[in-house]
Amino acid sequence: MSGTNLDGNDEFDEQLRMQELYGDGKDGDTQTDAGGEPDSLGQQPTDTPYEWDLDKKAWFPKITEDFIATYQANYGFSNDGASSSTANVEDVHARTAEEPPQEKAPEPTDARKKGEKRKAESGWFHVEEDRNTNVYVSGLPPDITVDEFIQLMSKFGIIMRDPQTEEFKVKLYKDNQGNLKGDGLCCYLKRESVELALKLLDEDEIRGYKLHVEVAKFQLKGEYDASKKKKKCKDYKKKLSMQQKQLDWRPERRAGPSRMRHERVVIIKNMFHPMDFEDDPLVLNEIREDLRVECSKFGQIRKLLLFDRHPDGVASVSFRDPEEADYCIQTLDGRWFGGRQITAQAWDGTTDYQVEETSREREERLRGWEAFLNAPEANRGLRRSDSVSASERAGPSRARHFSEHPSTSKMNAQETATGMAFEEPIDEKKFEKTEDGGEFEEGASENNAKESSPEKEAEEGCPEKESEEGCPKRGFEGSCSQKESEEGNPVRGSEEDSPKKESKKKTLKNDCEENGLAKESEDDLNKESEEEVGPTKESEEDDSEKESDEDCSEKQSEDGSEREFEENGLEKDLDEEGSEKELHENVLDKELEENDSENSEFEDDGSEKVLDEEGSEREFDEDSDEKEEEEDTYEKVFDDESDEKEDEEYADEKGLEAADKKAEEGDADEKLFEESDDKEDEDADGKEVEDADEKLFEDDDSNEKLFDEEEDSSEKLFDDSDERGTLGGFGSVEEGPLSTGSSFILSSDDDDDDI
C-alpha cells in the first residue's frame, strides 16, 4: 500500500517539475485574463482542475461543461463561428469521431445521379445518323420470302449477321393476322451500302410492285417495356471477328452438297511387304519418293504416309480436293509397282492402319541394334557398303516403278518376247559356227599339235577371245609377259588413240618385228581387246582380224629370231626371246619380270616348263595325237574355205621370209618395217573382199582364218628348225587342266550369251 502511494507521489512530483519548467512565464505578459483563456503558448490557466488517471498514470484536465465549451469554441463548432486555439490530448479522438458524418453527407447526391442513368437506359434509344446502317424498304410483293429479300438486298452490300444466331439481320413486317404487310428492314455492315441501295433500288420494280427505299427511322409507338428488351451482346471480339469474316475475300461455299473430308485420302495397298525393309531400310525412302512423284501428277499432295509395319503394305495419300483423290483412284487402281499389283480406294474415315510394335519385336530390334554397336568398326563398314550397294541395285528408277494397266503390260511383254525370239536364232547360229570353225582349224595340221596343244585347248573353249585366262596361245608365257611389261604399253596406247583397224595392225607388226617375238604380240592383243571392248560381238570381229595380222608377223619373227640367234648370240636379247637357248639361260630373269605381269599363273607354269622339257614333250605328243583324231572329223566340213585362205597366207609367208633375209644382211629393222607395212595393206585389201562376200558370218570367217594362219606358220617353223622338242617343251602338262578350266568357263559364258 505504501509502495503504491510512493509511486503516485513520484509521478506527481515529476509532473509538477515539468509544469514549472515550461510554465515559468505564467505571471508575465503571457498571463491570461480573468476569463480563464489560455496564453499564447497554449498553456492551460492555473485555475484549471486536473484529475489523476489510474490507467494512464498521468494528470489530465478535468472535463467539465466549461471545458467542453472551450473545446468546441477552439474547433469551430460554436454557434457564433468563433475559432480558438485551445488544444488538448482528447482532440484527436474527438476529431476522428466527428469526421465520418462529413464523408457520408454527399452520398445521397451520387446515388441519385446513378439512378438517373439507369432510368435513361431503360427508356427509348436513339441511333446516330452517321452510324445508322438500316434501310427501310416498302412496296414489296406480298408473296416475297426472306431468302428472296436477302438475295435482293445483298446486291448492294454485305448484310450484317447477328453475333449470337449468325443469321442475317433482316425483317419482314407482318400484320396482326400474320400476313406480310409489304415492307421490310435490312441492316448493312457498312454505311456506304445504305447510300448505294438508296441510289439503285429506290423506285425500282419487282413483279410489278414499285419499291421505295429510305433510311430507317426508329420511333416509339405505344408503350415501350424496357424489361423485355434483349440484352446487349457484350462479346465485342466475337462481333468484330464475324464482321471481319464477312469482309474478307474468301469465296463462298458451293451451293451443292459438300463432300466429306475423308474422301480426300486415298489408301493404296500391296505396295510392299514389311520384310523388304529388314535388309535395307533405305528402300522405304525410295518407295515414298516414287509414290510422291507419281501421285503429284493428280494434284497437290498434303500428306503422304507409309505404314511400314502393316502386312498389306498400306500407304495413304491425302490430296487437297476430293476430285483429285478420285482421279488418283481411277488411275492407280490395278496398276503394277515393283512386281506387285496395287489397289487404290478412298479412306472410310475410321480405319487405323498404324500397326504398333509388339514387345517381342521391340526386343529383337534392340538386340540387333546392340549387336551392331558391339561389332568391330571393320564389320560396320562392310555392312554399310553392302547396304549402299543394295540400295543402288534397288534404285527407284531401275527396280521399282509404276507400270501400266495389266492389259498394256501384257501387250508389252508379248512384243518383247517376239523380239527376243527373233534375235535368238541369229546369235545361236553365229556361236555354233564360230565354235565349229575353231575346232576345225585346230585339226588342220598334225605337226602343230606338239607346239600349240595348250593353244588349241584355249581356242576350243574361247573362239571369241572373251577371257584373259583362256587365251594363252603359246608355251612361252613367261617371255610373253616379260615383253608385254616392257613394250605392251605403247601398243595399247596406239590402239586406243587410233580408231582405225589398219593403224592398229601396223603398230602391232612393227613391234613384233623389232622384238622378234610374234607370240608376245598375240597375247598383248588378246589382253588389249578384252580390256577395251569386252565380251561383245564387235570385240570378237576385231580380235579375229587382229589375230590374223599377228600370225603374219609371227611367221616372220619366229624365223628371223632363230637365224639371228645363231649369228649374234646373246647380243639381241629382247629380239630373240622366242628362241629356246636364250630361255634356258635367262630363266631366273624371266621369273622376276613375270611376277610384275598380269598373268601370274601362266608365268609360274613357264618356269616349271623349262625344268621339265623332256617329260612335257612326250605328254604333248600324246595330247596332240588324241586331238588329231578328234579334229579330223571337222577338217572335211570347212575344207574348201580353209584351202583358199591357206593359199593367200602362203603367199604372205613368202614375202615375210624375203623380209627376214634382208634384215640379216643389213638395216634389218628399217626394211622389216617397210615390208610389214606393204604386206599389211595387202592383207587389209584381202579382208575387205572377204567381208563383202560374207557379211553375215564375217566374224566366223575371221576366226577360221586366224586359226589356219597360226597352224600353217607353226608348221613352217618346225620345217625350218630341228628344235621341235625344245619348243614343245615349253608347254608343260600343267597347262592342260588350266586350259580346260578356262575353256569350261568360256563355254558357260557362251551359253549365257545364247540365252
From Swiss-Prot:
Tissue specificity annotation: Widely expressed.
Residue stretches making up the RRM domain: 133-218, 264-349
Family matches, as Pfam families: RRM_1
Glycyl lysine isopeptide (Lys-Gly) (interchain with G-Cter in SUMO2) cross-link, renumbered residues: K429, K430
GO biological process: double-strand break repair via homologous recombination; mRNA splicing, via spliceosome; protein localization to site of double-strand break; U2-type prespliceosome assembly
Post-translational note: Phosphorylation at Ser-748 by CK2 during S-phase in response to DNA damage promotes interaction with TOPBP1 and double-strand break (DSB) repair via homologous recombination.
Keyword presence, DNA repair: yes
Modification N-acetylserine occurs at: S2
GO molecular function: chromatin-protein adaptor activity; poly-ADP-D-ribose modification-dependent protein binding; RNA binding
Compositional bias (Basic and acidic residues): 90-122, 462-476, 508-538, 553-563, 580-590, 652-674, 714-725
Keywords: Acetylation, Activator, Chromosome, DNA damage, DNA repair, Isopeptide bond, mRNA processing, mRNA splicing, Nucleus, Phosphoprotein, Repeat, RNA-binding, Spliceosome, Transcription, Transcription regulation, Ubl conjugation
Residues bearing the modification Phosphothreonine: T633
Chain positions with N6-acetyllysine modification: K297
Mediates interaction with the P-TEFb complex: annotated span: 381-755
Location of this chain's protein in the cell: Nucleus; Chromosome
Keyword Transmembrane helix applies: no
UniProt feature, compositional bias: Acidic residues: 539-552, 564-579, 591-606, 613-633, 640-651, 675-713
UniProt region (Disordered), positions on chain: 1-53, 81-122, 380-415, 433-755
Compositionally biased residues, Polar residues: 405-415
Modified residues (Phosphoserine): 387, 403, 407, 409, 445, 452-453, 481, 485, 494, 498, 521, 529, 557, 561, 579, 597, 600, 607, 616, 624, 642, 676, 702, 713-714, 721, 748
GO CC annotation: nucleoplasm; nucleus; site of double-strand break; spliceosomal complex; U2 snRNP; U2-type spliceosomal complex
InterPro entries linked to this entry: Nucleotide-bd_a/b_plait_sf, RBD_domain_sf, RRM_dom, TatSF1-like, TatSF1-like_RRM1
Self-association state and partner proteins as the record states: Component of the 17S U2 SnRNP complex, a ribonucleoprotein complex that contains small nuclear RNA (snRNA) U2 and a number of specific proteins. Within the 17S U2 SnRNP complex, interacts (via UHM region) directly with SF3B1. Component of a complex which is at least composed of HTATSF1/Tat-SF1, the P-TEFb complex components CDK9 and CCNT1, RNA polymerase II, SUPT5H, and NCL/nucleolin. Interacts with GTF2F2/RAP30 and POLR2A. Interacts with TCERG1/CA150. Interacts with (poly-ADP-ribosylated) RPA1; promoting HTATSF1 recruitment to DNA damage sites.
Reported function: Component of the 17S U2 SnRNP complex of the spliceosome, a large ribonucleoprotein complex that removes introns from transcribed pre-mRNAs. The 17S U2 SnRNP complex (1) directly participates in early spliceosome assembly and (2) mediates recognition of the intron branch site during pre-mRNA splicing by promoting the selection of the pre-mRNA branch-site adenosine, the nucleophile for the first step of splicing. Within the 17S U2 SnRNP complex, HTATSF1 is required to stabilize the branchpoint-interacting stem loop. (Microbial infection) In case of infection by HIV-1, it is up-regulated by the HIV-1 proteins NEF and gp120, acts as a cofactor required for the Tat-enhanced transcription of the virus.
Family indicated by similarity: Belongs to the HTATSF1 family.
Protein name per the record: 17S U2 SnRNP complex component HTATSF1
